[in-house]
Amino acid sequence: GRAFAEAGFVALHVQHPGSDAGIWQGSGNAGMALAAAAFDVMQAVARLRDGAFALDEALRRAARPGDPLRGRVDAARIAAAGHSYGAWTVQHLIGQRLPGLGAVPGLVLPDPRLRAGIALSPVRPQGLPPRIAFAPVAEPLLSVTGTRDAGYIENATPADREVPFRSISGVPQALAVLDGATHGAFADEAAAGPRWADPTYHARTAALCVAFLRAVLLRDAAAARLLAGGAPGLLAPGDRLEVKDWPV
């Protein structure tokens, strides 16, 4: 969020009661608490509703006289970003199908106000073949993962993290795989246990995310060329970056 703000973007952070840090704080078994929340269908739906609510509220406040957000939110240039369960949330907000759930009253998916998504540790779809699950996705997506980004709950492999990028077609995408990065490397939640407090890759991730948003939201040709060229100067030896259906 700090990197976005420093680059001139409004950055809003959304809390998800029932599936956020509160579920493991004070818990005797953080892993069990996380797993229970991850497989709770009602919490999944609540997360998607939270995303829609956050967009509603941001746009409402941007139009309200005297509000700090007044005039600061460009409704035509909104993106959503998240890590792990947050990545799952982003993927569905921009169009990934929800198997077996059908229409959710009061919730429009994909959310037509989103123009891009960023998924840190993307999540492979469950219950549908990937190409069917991702067929409705029509907005640019940046996927960031690591060579050791295995799942603690769903037994995801590092290769699974690349499935959204491999399965989505027809829209600009970028995939960054950071050498040595684990699932926890993108979280930096020391209070959740040592697995979530790995040395972070935040500087590289933040720089990639800013370049991606500049390229797809601001139509910044220099940022688009930077990513198309492998982002020299942003990545470390052993990292790799791919683009797909990229506008350069």
Model-predicted regions and their roles:
Residues 77-79, 118:
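Residue in the alpha/beta-hydrolase core beta-strand immediately N-terminal to the catalytic nucleophile
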Residues 1-15, 21:
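Short amphipathic alpha-helix adjacent to the substrate-entry channel of hydrolases
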Residues 103-180:
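The feature captures the conserved acid-bearing segment of alpha/beta-hydrolase catalytic domains
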